[in-house]
């Protein structure tokens, strides 16, 4: 069990997870864990051929996130220091279930549980829920070359997958707090009041 608040920002590709996590980290002075996306050597290949490279991609992410969370537990959470992350480790399962073959998925889930069962889990999730047009606009705006290859149908599937996953996480942990942010109507970057409403919920958690 965590000895300190562990906050995860989640949502589909382009929802604004890292942006919001960074803003909250700066406001409250929390250490931040952010996933290393562009350093994944399989990412560009993955969007060229999802079937061929999905297992390698997901294993890279899993191992990298495992190390991050292990270090975070030792250096911060066990010492009572709140932490914010721009992902929940369960996102590995969300993406793996979407892209891996049944045979690969069976192997992957065994490794996933072996690595993550004793890792700290977030006790507060901020879920940024956004529609396809919003995600496409934000993906285009940030201009990552490999994301230009993302198919619209893949994003649509992820939107649905995230809805299911958030419900699963809540059912698995009744004490988990989930704050859903409407990413279509709320602009926490340009509208200070939208950000402050989110920050107020975080403040309630840590006082």
Swiss-Prot record:
Keywords: ATP-binding, Kinase, Nucleotide-binding, Transferase. It catalyses: 2'-deoxyguanosine + ATP = dGMP + ADP + H(+). Substrate binds at residues 35, 47, 147. The keyword DNA repair does not apply. Its EC number is 2.7.1.113. The active site is at 86 (proton acceptor). GO terms for cellular component: cytoplasm. The keyword Membrane does not apply. It is an enzyme of class 2 (transferase). ATP binds at residues 11-19. It comes from the Bacteria. Optimum pH is around pH 9 (with saturating concentrations of dGuo and UTP). At pH 7.5 and 11.5 more than 80% of maximal activity is still observed. At pH 6.0, 60% activity remains, whereas the enzyme is completely inactive below pH 5.6. One of its GO terms (molecular function) is deoxynucleoside kinase activity. Inhibited by deoxyguanosine at concentrations above 30 uM only with UTP as phosphate donor. dGTP is a potent competitive inhibitor. Plays an essential role in generating the deoxyribonucleotide precursors dGTP for DNA metabolism. Highly specific toward deoxyguanosine (dGuo) and deoxyinosine (dIno). Only marginal activity is observed with guanosine. UTP is slightly more efficient as phosphate donor than CTP, ATP and GTP. Catalysis proceeds by a classical ping-pong bi-bi reaction mechanism. Belongs to the DCK/DGK family. This is Deoxyguanosine kinase. It comes from Bacillus subtilis (strain 168). The gene is dgk.
